[in-house]
């Protein structure tokens, strides 16, 4: 029966993988719902306050760029050639060979530069043209050949063109998507969890599928009780911090994190799913690797380490077991539990795996930085070639002996190693940091320039264009059976109690990596959700000619912000009432759907604007003169933050105004006034009163 359960778990997992690759959106069991277009009023304020409504910020985001592109190509004829030119340059930069770049560079020059020069309509500088022409004459076609044009295209798009985008419906859609992104609160219900694929000191790793996009991930679950029992809180939180540092930017050689969240019992990391097993497993199955095969793995690992080091992260646990293969055979560095940020202070702790730790890591009290990883790289490459660490002779398991040899022994390299390989390993395995390859001031570049890698084009390595030496078998789960992986003994943590103080440690644990969420959405459901939302909004407009009525009321007035909130302010009502609110400098107005009369609350009558909680949801509490109060609830976190800020600012400014006009201060007023005489749309005075 156990065997049958294992087979069924494998089949279910493999089917989910295949369907996710083919049509991930079709696998989505939940649907992303975009908020009403009126969210723009609040979100634009929210983003502006954080410096996010700039050309650079929006253009550099995946969803921002896609909406930008749609607007320019379909609604702004004058910007269309610029966007097309930009995209052709991006395609050129990803070409694999120099031959391809020679042909494509000439085509781009003829179509987008020479054509405009002949028509005397070239909007770019003479320097940019001469830069490209000079290289083409010499038949030099580096990937960044057109970089001056990229900068000038962006400069051209940055002005009036960008302002037209901000005024368009496409920016409204951007605000809708940003609201969704900034209001992500993940739970286990957002994932379909499949079979276990690994186990560590604090928990397990499972294959899983994200419900709203259908994308497959690895879910690393750490048990909070086990963490407490082993006093591993610092390690768990450190891993989350290190993953957040390395998971931004384009790096296909690290197992990156897209999300982190927690439940009362577990900490969960949502990571890139790697289905090909690890190098330790393949070394045991395949036997030692040739120099050529090892070169492939070394090159991809070097780029992964370079990405970390550029972010001032030292990995500290490089070994074959931590190098995972994807289904195509390319590798990523995994498990950042021992990684450390050395940007402000260099570490000096002796951590890592014996046989791979650098001498400076083993020496007590000695500070180190990325130097430690280059020594570990030398040890790992030696193991891939010989089957054991250079400091683990005769299969000894004595850690003290391994450490002693690391600190004192000069590594003897076999005569079978090529001179280029010997040079590389001798450089990496230098005990003296000041003489070690990678530690002489130029980091990874020193290793890339080693004669051992002379045959490689590092751009092609980055683009993963070299064929892997080993491709994991398809249709198999390259992990041990669930029963072989085993499970933790629940008795171990039976006496461990999680207190409020324990949970408080993880208060800031949840995280969404913006660029990875946007990439996930773009690859899966972006077009589908946009099309469905367009249809829904068009249907509402056709059904109700008054759609947009709420927003129209704010036009031409001194309305600070407007949008939907739910209120609970009537002592006879215990249910939330959804209303559309308008904030003016001297009052707050609101009305219900299909209601002509509306109510208002003047700033003079408000005594305070506070944040409160009702059933674990944050709300706004407006205390009114006479002992009354209103409670307002927002649909998302950004809305709550912005309404609180704007209400407090308006209240504060109104108070200052009242202080300057003493006669108005004690004038009695009704706290809430119903404006029932004139329909909302007809009221058009300059100050709205």
Curated annotation (Swiss-Prot):
Please tell me where ATP binds in this chain. 197-205, 220
Q: What subcellular locations does the record give?
A: Cytoplasm; Cell membrane; Postsynapse; Presynapse
Activity control note: In contrast to other AGC family kinases, the catalytic activity is solely regulated by the binding of substrates and ligands, not by phosphorylation of the kinase domain.
Q: Which PROSITE patterns match?
A: AGC_KINASE_CTER, PH_DOMAIN, PROTEIN_KINASE_ATP, PROTEIN_KINASE_DOM, PROTEIN_KINASE_ST, RGS
Q: Which residues form the active site?
A: 317 (proton acceptor)
Catalysed transformations (reactions): [beta-adrenergic receptor] + ATP = [beta-adrenergic receptor]-phosphate + ADP + H(+)
Query: What GO biological process, any one, is recorded here?
Result: negative regulation of adenylate cyclase-activating G protein-coupled receptor signaling pathway
Primary enzyme class = transferase
Which keywords accompany this UniProt record?
Answer: ATP-binding, Cell membrane, Cell projection, Cytoplasm, Kinase, Membrane, Nucleotide-binding, Phosphoprotein, Serine/threonine-protein kinase, Synapse, Transferase
Q: Where is this region: N-terminal?
A: 1-190
> CDD domains per the record?
PH_GRK2_subgroup, RGS_GRK2_GRK3, STKc_GRK2
Q: Where is the AGC-kinase C-terminal domain?
A: 454-521
Q: Which residues form the Protein kinase domain?
A: 191-453
Q: Does the keyword Lipid metabolism apply?
A: no
RGS domain: which residues? 54-175
Which residue numbers delimit the PH domain? 558-652
Q: Of which family is this protein a member?
A: Belongs to the protein kinase superfamily. AGC Ser/Thr protein kinase family. GPRK subfamily.
Q: What does this protein do?
A: Specifically phosphorylates the agonist-occupied form of the beta-adrenergic and closely related receptors, probably inducing a desensitization of them. Key regulator of LPAR1 signaling. Competes with RALA for binding to LPAR1 thus affecting the signaling properties of the receptor. Desensitizes LPAR1 and LPAR2 in a phosphorylation-independent manner. Positively regulates ciliary smoothened (SMO)-dependent Hedgehog (Hh) signaling pathway by facilitating the trafficking of SMO into the cilium and the stimulation of SMO activity.
Q: Which comment does the entry carry about domains?
A: The PH domain binds anionic phospholipids and helps recruiting ADRBK1 from the cytoplasm to plasma membrane close to activated receptors. It mediates binding to G protein beta and gamma subunits, competing with G-alpha subunits and other G-betagamma effectors.
Kindly state the subunit structure of this protein: Interacts with the heterodimer formed by GNB1 and GNG2. Interacts with GIT1. Interacts with, and phosphorylates chemokine-stimulated CCR5. Interacts with ARRB1. Interacts with LPAR1 and LPAR2. Interacts with RALA in response to LPAR1 activation. ADRBK1 and RALA mutually inhibit each other's binding to LPAR1. Interacts with ADRB2.
- What's the protein here called? Beta-adrenergic receptor kinase 1
Classification from the root reads: Eukaryota, Metazoa, Chordata, Craniata, Vertebrata
